[in-house]
């Protein structure tokens, strides 16, 4: 896959360390690390309104057609599909757009097509999962926080019936939160105040109005 740009963020090391602490539930350490990341270089936000996240990305990169933004979600969070982050659906040996049109969906155009192309990630029509984006980056991902990761009694509880499956969920969110070159926006659905409180504790800001 030819992304035509480097997939290494200049703040990748610092962001990776922060994400590791966040996912481990070590919130004080995560907050201390976040405060050291230059905010002018890497922007981390959360929002409870998906439409605002989409509007922010479109406005921020309106005059930068080379930039890429899109929606990414956990493969074990189907509830996000009903909230505006649908995934491509599996058919016989192929994936299809979730609108029922029968149009085939492929991951390469999602990353590579021009920002005004309907198959581009910038169309904000289809969300991809950790399996589609592992090892790849876009400039500003909108990360959907799913029902498979909950903050209960001051620690994360990830969906899974054994240590191996839980490890997969932990790694999933580690992947999702480290796909951005310019930053990330986490969409936290209504009713998930547990997650919003965590993001406030580690000093991640609410998505601002675009100037």
Question: Model-found features: residue ranges?
Answer:
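Conserved coupling/interface region of RecA-like P-loop/ASCE motor cores
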Residues: 1-48, 62, 189-190
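Generic detector of well-ordered alpha-helical segments enriched in charged/polar residues
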Residues: 4, 16-24, 31, 51-58, ...
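Short, flexible loop/turn elements at secondary-structure junctions
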Residues: 5-7, 48, 73-77, 131, ...
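Short secondary-structure junctions and interdomain/linker hinges
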Residues: 10, 26-30, 60-69, 179-187, ...
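Accessory C-terminal helicase-associated subdomains
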Residues: 37-133, 181-185, 193-198
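C-terminal accessory regions
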Residues: 121-211
């Amino acid at each position: 896959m030819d992304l035509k740009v480097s997939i290494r963020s200049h703040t990748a090391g610092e962001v990776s360390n922060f994400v590791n602490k966040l996912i481990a539930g070590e919130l004080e350490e995560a907050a201390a690390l976040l405060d050291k990341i230059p905010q002018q270089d890497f922007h981390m936000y959360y929002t409870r309104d998906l439409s605002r996240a989409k509007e922010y990305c479109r406005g921020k990169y309106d005059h930068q057609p080379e930039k890429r933004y899109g929606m990414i979600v956990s493969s074990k969070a189907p509830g996000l599909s009903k909230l505006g982050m649908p995934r491509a659906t599996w058919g016989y040996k192929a994936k299809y757009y979730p609108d029922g049109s029968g149009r085939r969906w492929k991951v390469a155009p999602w990353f590579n097509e021009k920002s005004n192309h309907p198959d581009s990630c910038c169309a904000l029509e289809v969300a991809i999962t950790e399996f589609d984006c592992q090892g790849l980056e876009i400039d500003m991902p909108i990360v959907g926080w799913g029902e498979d990761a909950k903050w209960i009694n001051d620690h994360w509880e990830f969906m899974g019936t054994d240590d191996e499956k839980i490890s997969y969920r932990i790694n999933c969110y580690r992947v999702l939160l480290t796909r951005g070159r310019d930053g990330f926006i986490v969409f936290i659905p209504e009713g998930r105040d547990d997650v919003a409180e965590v993001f406030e504790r580690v000093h991640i800001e609410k998505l601002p109005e675009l100037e």
